[in-house]
Design a protein with these regions (language model features):
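Short, cationic motifs built from Arg/Lys/His that form the positively charged side of catalytic pockets
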Residues: 6-7, 46, 103
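Conserved tyrosine-mediated DNA breakage-rejoining catalytic core shared by Y-recombinases
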Residues: 13-60, 128-134
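Active-site/catalytic core of tyrosine-dependent DNA strand-transfer enzymes
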Residues: 23, 49-97, 101, 105-106, ...
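Catalytic-site neighborhood detector that most strongly recognizes the C-terminal catalytic loop/helix
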Residues: 30-36, 55, 113, 124-159
Length: 162
């Protein structure tokens, strides 16, 4: 969760066919993104660049998988884990954090690392509240987001090593 800082539902219900591990990309279908249901059918997929550390973890996870889901339910491989499962796992490891809190931490630290707000907001799949700008600006900032996500993963690894 800290590496990709997507929403709880986006991660826990992720399916293997959304990933291209060779290209280090994850495309979350628009229908699974936050928003009004009637708007989702036309929503493009959300691009999540995967740092090399994430790709390595996903290959390891995929090796032992027998489900279409990254995180299948314990007793039903054709369903994803429950809404509460990630929080329960965090508590089990005595980690005082909510799942959504990873998004706050990432946004705050990436701003402190001087990444531009529009790059961070694009990665977090936040809509631009300025309707005129949102209408005209369809930039995805892919190159910048790829670099940012690798820098973020390297930063997390450095914290873990210290």
């Amino acid at each position: 969760m800290p590496y990709v800082f997507v929403r709880n539902t986006e991660l826990r219900c992720a399916m293997w066919d959304e990933f291209d591990l060779d290209a280090a990309e994850w495309f979350i279908p628009g229908i699974r993104m936050k928003g009004r249901q009637q708007d989702k059918k036309d929503m493009p997929p959300h691009f999540v660049p995967l740092a090399r550390q994430v790709v390595k973890l996903l290959w390891e996870l995929k090796e032992g998988s027998n489900s279409d889901y990254l995180f299948p339910a314990a007793y039903h491989k054709n369903k994803c884990i429950t809404d509460a499962a990630p929080l329960v796992a965090l508590k089990r490891f005595e980690f005082c954090q909510t799942v959504h809190g990873f998004r706050t931490i990432a946004s705050t630290h990436l701003h402190e690392m001087n990444f531009p707000s529009q790059i961070i907001e694009a990665q977090m799949a936040h809509k631009d509240r300025n309707e005129v700008r949102a209408t005209y600006n369809k930039a995805e900032y892919k190159t910048e987001r790829i670099a940012m996500m690798q820098t973020w993963a390297d930063y997390l690894d450095a914290l873990a090593d210290s």
